[in-house]
Amino acid sequence: MDPNNRIVIKGAREHNLKNVDLELPRDKLIVMTGLSGSGKSSLAFDTIYADGQRRYMESLSSYARQFLGQMEKPDVDEITGLSPAISIDQKTTSHNPRSTVGTVTEIYDYLRLMYARIGVPHCPICGREITQQTVDEMVDEVMKLPERTRFQVLAPVVRARKGTQAKELDAARRAGFARVRVDGNMYDLSEEINLEKNIKHTVEIVVDRLVINDTVRGRLADSIETALAQANGLVVIDVIGGEPMMFSQSYACPEHGISVEELTPRMFSFNNPFGACEKCTGLGTFMKVDPARVIPDKRKSIRESAIKASGWYYAEGSISEMTYKALGKRYGFTLDTPVKDFSKEALHALLYGTGDERIEMQRESMFGSGTYFNQFEGIIPNLERRFRETSSEWVKEEIALVMSSEECPACHGRRLKPTSLAVTVGGINIADFCDKSVNEELDFINTAKVSTRDEMIGAPIFKEVKERLGFLKSVGLGYLTLSRGAASLSGGESQRIRLATQIGSALTGVLYVLDEPSIGLHQRDNDKLIATMKRLRDLGNTLIVVEHDEDTMRQADYIVDVGPGAGVHGGEIVAAGSVADICKVKRSITGAYLSGRKFVEVPETRREGNGKALRVVKAHENNLQDITVDFPLGKLICVTGVSGSGKSTLVNEILYKTLAAALNGARSRPGQCEAVEGMEWVDKVIGIDQSPIGRTPRSNPATYTGVFGDIRTLFSNTQDAKMRGYGPGRFSFNVKGGRCEACEGGGILTIEMHFLPDIYVPCDVCKGKRYNRETLEVKYKDKTISDVLDMTVEEACVFFANIPKIARKLQTLQEVGLGYIQLGQAATTLSGGEAQRVKLANELARRDTGQTVYILDEPTTGLHVADVHRLVKVLDKLVDAGNTVIVIEHNLDVIKRADYIIDLGPEGGSGGGTIVATGTPEEVAQNPHSFTGQYLRPVLERAAELQSQK
């Protein structure tokens, strides 16, 4: 390898890496693979990327570095040949409700510019195209005011702009004006006016003060002309005691008199007060308390806890009980009356209050009783007021459980002011454009009819928008709309959006480190993704991709296999080179699967199920097109389809939420369908997603699975603990007593970074052990409680082998391929796939009924094919016990093992939402309309060939 064209790593020891030496070619597509926990991410992200980032930070000035903090040097002897590094992972999804696909990709900025430069304004009321106004037309409009109306003619020289505005104020003085209105307050220009520099101000010069009469027309025309000259064609008529009138020399509707100022990009921004809808401030939605969530089951009475809202749960002797009794006395119900039997008036008073009417309240306490009269606010107004006013995040979260998002009645979810929405290009406004899919937007831009002049002005903008939309399409995201909220994107989607954005930036000589970009991607779209990564490489960049996808490996220039096992059994370079090189290495598990020496078998027979089924009738949420789907029970079911075809909507939004509401009493609102039939055959539903098992470093696999409670009890039963009088609570790091008080049992201290995510550093007192010295003196088999938390699951399985209660829970973690994680590993450091498997292990450890429905969303995320093999066996075990497992999956090794496939499509977005194929994998593979079938057929054929050789 050319010494000038390589990245050389010497002595990498980060996490479980064992003094790794490695050479990587530059300007190539490199795939790092290996078992989950083998050390791939430690090498790619925590060593190579971290050192590239640290070196960049050190090149900045000390002033800039004070805001960024000190980056720790990775545990590595030396890395040479490193370029500036950019990480594209899945943990940086925006949760800001104002972020959309359009804003994240910056395409929306170009659209705002496009609508500002070549947009055609219309009247928001009549839809008529708006043209320029003359001074005479403005005068005629003002003269329509009633006789004797007093008004001021103002010239708005500054509109909502930061700064002291000294220059504009001096110019007004020199021009001979006497008064000025600043932010609604009048000032004399002869006095000194000091404005706050960092606040936005509006400055309007008072040109004239007039009263409507027969003789004022000439003077009014002169004053308007003066104001227009001062304020670049704008004038404000401030009617005393009435609504102000604004005129523009540019645009106004002749029929309704609505003026539109000169079009600017900020008019089309929903994050700017000039463009945002005034009612919802640009969010497009409101959070409102949902009566159906406050009282989810009207068959129950108040005493039976029919009301499920923060502060309003029924309890004897509480203020809520006193209120309910008073309402019952006034409106004729008791605490034992089912809510469904309440009169309309009674239910309205309970939920929305008694208005001005005071009702008799009977107060009882240990000091006696008394009567007083008071108005009742109502449960819903009370909750909404508390939600607005509270500073407690916990209270907000509690109230949010009974709230739902409702479309803004003013803008109908479109986020912008009526005047902004009345501007069109090619006949559609900016919100309509953003509601189209990326594929439809590309078609629209290519066919939009605009004038020759507008085409010349808009050509460079069209070019930028088309390029960026093309990049989104090339990474398999053609089904997304630009108006879609960034928070609703999956990890894989947000990562591919950032990948498309990087291609748009066209940087060269950069090191990109990617974390499983193929997650959530159908095999059809995976080919596009690989082509995109090659395109980034061909620009002159190096790509290091942590990936398990076989197609990506076969297309890579160079593969690094890290292993051979996970955790302490990993951390070595097992093989490096081409696919052929990897296949030759006998100890490479990746090579064994790539060469066909090992493979995931196709079952000889498919399960028949129990003959019963769940049926979703006429599902029409999002892009689902009134489909009716059967989910046969007692089978392993795979729901497949290209990205955006409606899989998550059908399974998570409709089926899971409906079952959870009916069987578990969940309060989430299910997606729209006519009915879900067959629920009587199921007694429990368990959804296992990739959300974190906890949002702070205090949460860990041991606490989540409940095994830590058993371990604490075990420690409290030791001779040493009994002598000292220590109970299980002594060994908790969440309560005072046994924990280190310096870090309050966290083992780490949180340092708030004002411009960046918080940084965690080990506690100086306990050195990260979480407990005080006395607690750590108690040992079980020569290990302290802190030592146990530092053990991997695999080590703990051996250590606690003789304690069945603990061993059983640990064994399930081992079964799902998590033998390498530590018991006390912070939840914040677990990937989405790892968190999902911790939840799966937690459910496996419970006693099941044989009538449970398990729903998993892409459980193979982050899994090597060997781990997938193990996971499939775990899922088989659940189904063999009589349960039903429904999996949303793209991984063909899982799909080929399914008993039943439901394939949605045929495309994503508006081109999806229908059932393309159902049946066994063999039946779907023969369906010519199914993209899944097309990729499944060769996989089944290869598996049959390998099994026959075996």
Segment roles from a protein language model:
Residues 1-950:
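Conserved phosphate-binding elements of NTP-dependent enzyme cores
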